[in-house]
């Protein structure tokens, strides 16, 4: 019995040595191993419930295997457009929870900071920056925005948009709220064009983000670019109106979420600076003149570049409860709201 046990131990040691050598060899040649008996990846030293993807190198989805990444994200600028003086532009409606507009703005910023902070801890080689561009917010609200930003370890800045710079550019007679909205978006486009970044995320100030939103968008963008071999657009929200039309679509696997191909959106989206510069003249139309639907230039862009929306939502648009452009399905709205009361 003793000899039998010793032989088993010796064989186990030999197997372990062989296993270690094999794992090292796989690492050298870039192969990953999945051990289905332990639900782990010995070559990555991770279990299967963890993120197996290596940012900028390979996207790994079990059981489909890996996608070699052909576009590595190195910098992301998040441009948050704020205005606390208007509850809902040109509408006499209240938002869900029926609070003042500034509270939605503050919680949007906090949620972005939290999500970006988590992403920055995962992706040490990506440069992040949060830029807040504001029009017509009250002095007290601007002070609060600065206070929130002061607690943010991510590089950031607050820019007050001078509306006078756009009076000669924007065509038509618009309400103060609509003019400010157009000017703020136009200013964001100019920032995106001139800033040193390869990825830009345009955000409106009533989208509360989940903690994993920025991480999922970064890894999914790299994966989808590598699949489509072209720049694309990612939305953070699973809009209700997407379910009101009987349209054919396609579903793709991102990092941890399903993503669906869509043909329409609002004006919160992430894309590359290359795409913005290439189609700047088309996007600029949204800042020069309001033609319904205002997002039409974006919709035209989606005919040549894929636009994808997550399922379930990574961010929720806190609009009126009856708006088909608002609350995403199957999300705990109250929990998301409460989580962003503070940083």
Where are each of the predicted segments found?
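Membrane-proximal basic amphipathic "stem/tether" segments
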Residues: 1-61
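Short, acidic, metal-binding catalytic loop of nucleotide-sugar glycosyltransferases
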Residues: 96-104, 108-125
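Short beta-strand/loop segment that forms part of the nucleotide-sugar
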Residues: 124-137, 161-163
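Active-site-proximal specificity loops/subdomain of glycosyltransferases
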Residues: 138-197
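Conserved catalytic core of nucleotide-sugar-dependent glycosyltransferases
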Residues: 192, 199, 210-283
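The conserved acidic donor/metal-binding loop of glycosyltransferases
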Residues: 205-208
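C-terminal catalytic/acceptor-binding lobe
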Residues: 273-343
């Amino acid at each position: 019995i003793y000899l039998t046990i010793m032989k088993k131990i010796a064989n186990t040691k030999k197997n372990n040595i062989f296993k270690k050598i094999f794992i090292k060899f796989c690492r050298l040649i870039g192969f990953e191993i999945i051990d289905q008996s332990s639900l782990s990846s010995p070559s990555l030293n991770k279990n299967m419930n963890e993120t197996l993807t290596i940012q900028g190198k390979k996207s790994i989805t079990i059981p489909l295997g890996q996608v070699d990444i052909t576009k590595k994200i190195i910098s992301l600028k998040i441009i948050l457009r704020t205005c606390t003086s208007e509850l809902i532009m040109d509408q006499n409606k209240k938002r869900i929870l029926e609070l003042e507009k500034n509270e939605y703005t503050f919680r949007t910023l906090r949620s972005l900071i939290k999500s970006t902070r988590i992403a920055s801890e995962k992706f040490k080689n990506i440069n992040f920056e949060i830029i807040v561009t504001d029009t017509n917010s009250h002095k007290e609200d601007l002070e609060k925005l600065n206070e929130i930003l002061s607690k943010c370890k991510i590089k950031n800045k607050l820019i007050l948009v001078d509306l006078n710079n756009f009076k000669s550019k924007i065509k038509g007679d618009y309400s103060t709220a609509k003019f400010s909205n157009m000017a703020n978006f136009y200013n964001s486009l100019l920032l995106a064009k001139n800033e040193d970044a390869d990825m830009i995320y345009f955000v409106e100030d009533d989208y509360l983000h989940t903690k994993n939103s920025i991480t999922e968008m970064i890894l999914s963008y790299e994966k989808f670019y590598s699949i489509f071999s072209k720049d694309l657009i990612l939305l953070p929200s699973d809009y209700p109106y997407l379910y009101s039309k009987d349209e054919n679509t396609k579903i793709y696997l991102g990092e941890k979420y399903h993503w669906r191909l869509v043909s329409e959106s609002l004006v919160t989206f992430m894309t590359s600076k290359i795409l913005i510069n290439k189609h700047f003249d088309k996007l600029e139309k949204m800042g020069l003149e309001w033609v319904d639907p205002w997002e039409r230039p974006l919709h035209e862009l989606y005919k040549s570049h894929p636009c994808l929306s997550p399922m379930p939502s990574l961010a929720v648009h806190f609009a009126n409860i009856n708006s088909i452009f608002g609350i995403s399905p199957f999300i705990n709205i109250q929990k998301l709201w409460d989580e962003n009361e503070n940083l």
